[in-house]
Amino acid sequence: FINTECSLEEYVNEIVKSFEEISKKKFIVNLSQDTNSFNIPKLIELVYGIRNFIGNANKFSKEKIYIFIKSDNKLSEISIEDDGPGYPKDILNKIGEPYIKSEIGNQNQKGLGLGIFIGKTLLERNRAKVICRNSQTRSGAEVVITWKNTDLKNL
C-alpha cells in the first residue's frame, strides 16, 4: 500500500475497505462531480492520519459514516462525518490537543484524545489543515481535512 501513488479517492476507499471488513456500520463515500483527480504519493503519515479520523467516526457513529471527497483547481478536501453524539461541548475548543478527555460521554467509548492528536499532527506535518467540529448537517462529529493542491502535489 505504501510507496506508490494514488488519488485521494483511492486513499479513502482503501482505508474504508479495511473498516468494512470488521465493522457493521455503513460507509457512504461520495466524490464531487467537479473533482480534479490527480495522484499523490502514498505516505504512511497520510494513511495513518486519515485512518485515525475514519476510525473515530466508525467508533462513535450509530450506523453511518459519511465521507465526501472534493478537489478543484486550488484545494482538495476530505470531509468525514458520523451520526454519533458529536464532540462534547466541554472539549470542543481543545480538540487536537493530547490527553483531552470529556467529563461527559459514553463510558464505553472513552479515550484520551491521542488518536485525534496523532491524526491531526501527522496530517498537518504533511501540509493539511484539519478542522474538527460538530456537524452542521448531521448529529455527529465532522472532520474536514484540506490541502492546497500545490502542497499536496509536492509531498
Predicted stretch roles:
Residues K64-K74:
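Short beta-strand/loop element within the Bergerat-fold HATPase_c
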Residues D82:
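Acidic ATP/Mg2+-coordinating residue in the GHKL
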